[in-house]
């Protein structure tokens, strides 16, 4: 009986760990150097998420870059923002999102503009 309970708990733990939302794609891509900057910031997730924070930093000058957040959806699998005009330099996008199960997920993408 205890073995059955342990097996069920193990299966439940595995299925719960796979249910969290994940970022499946981000543009600009992490660790990429661009000669031509993408026209937008695009984030794709495997489930509906609410983007609760997104910032862009020019890493080499320690400057925060203003982003136009008006196009953000409340909950969506894909979030798109217009890309601000960027000069040559190293940049980072940091983001946080709320998944349907209430967990906060976060990440970053570092890229360079030549």
Task: List PLM regions with ranges.
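Positively charged n-region of N-terminal signal peptides that target proteins for export
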Residues: 1-6
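N-terminal signal peptide c-region/cleavage motif recognized by signal peptidases
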Residues: 14-16
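N-terminal edge beta-strand
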Residues: 18-37
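Acidic, low-complexity Ser/Thr/Gly/Pro-rich repeat segments typical of extracellular/periplasmic
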Residues: 34-36, 42-112
